[in-house]
């Protein structure tokens, strides 16, 4: 249980529930009534005698992880339109167990960023539109700040999102495009009109010879970084990676508070 719990803690979960524990009457034969989809936190589980110590560990950890605010380095744009386009067939159902098949490129991107020593949160279109730049940092609607936003090899992007990213850069934010600029709009509704507007926005992006070289281009008050190499591009942002991740192979999550920062660290 503890390794799984630690994985959830470093992933940002800070409030644990043992949900779905089934009722079992006293007269039920051992091991009692069970349900496959719930946790078996009951006297018939051999962890039961150690449960108080385990609960104390959870309480202490999540108490600290509920203090302060999240302090992850980057926002990563979720390329949902690319994911939808790349799926075979037309019926897409929610599936928590097939994400490696549904989003292999995005998963690889997330692991690459993490292995470079950084933490991130994902962001969708609606939250991008409500994000603003304050003192060079990205401030989301929920009040959490980030040092830059990463656009990971996105091919399809709505015009309003690309336009808002450019406005954020103009206001002082750092925008990182990896592998390529967005190339087209998603969907077919009013396609020609939307493509025309999208093309006008594309012309406002910095002209670069190739994504093979990492380039940081000043863009009014902000910076637009382009390149294929994540480590080089992220270094250009000026964000310092966590050495405990890059050098020692540890996993951690960082939170900020009035007096500084605190960490949860797992080996």
Residues covered by each model-derived region:
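Carbohydrate-binding surfaces of carbohydrate-active enzymes
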Residues: 1-267
């Amino acid at each position: 249980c503890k390794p799984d719990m630690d994985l959830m803690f470093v992933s940002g979960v800070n409030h644990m529930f043992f949900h779905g524990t089934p009722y079992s009457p006293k007269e039920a034969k051992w091991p009692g009534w069970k349900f496959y989809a719930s946790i078996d936190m009951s006297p018939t589980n051999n962890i039961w005698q150690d449960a108080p110590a385990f609960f104390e560990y959870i309480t202490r950890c999540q108490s600290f992880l509920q203090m302060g605010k999240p302090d992850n380095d980057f926002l990563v744009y979720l390329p949902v339109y690319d994911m939808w386009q790349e799926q075979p067939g037309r019926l897409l159902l929610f599936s928590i167990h097939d994400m490696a098949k549904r989003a292999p490129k995005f998963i690889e991107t997330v692991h690459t960023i993490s292995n470079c020593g950084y933490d991130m949160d994902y962001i969708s279109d609606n939250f991008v539109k409500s994000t603003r730049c304050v003192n060079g940092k990205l401030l989301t609607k929920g009040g959490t700040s980030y040092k830059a936003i990463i656009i990971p090899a996105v091919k399809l992007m709505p015009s309003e999102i690309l336009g808002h990213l450019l406005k954020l850069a103009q206001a002082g934010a750092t925008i990182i495009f990896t592998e390529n600029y967005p190339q087209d709009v998603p969907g077919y509704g009013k396609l020609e009109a939307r493509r025309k507007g999208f093309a006008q926005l594309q012309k406002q992006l910095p002209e670069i010879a190739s994504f093979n070289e990492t380039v940081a281009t000043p863009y009014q008050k902000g910076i637009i970084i382009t390149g294929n190499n994540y480590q080089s591009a992220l270094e250009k942002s000026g964000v310092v990676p966590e050495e405990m991740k890059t050098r020692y192979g540890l996993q951690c999550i960082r939170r900020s508070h009035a007096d500084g920062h605190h960490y949860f660290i797992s080996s």
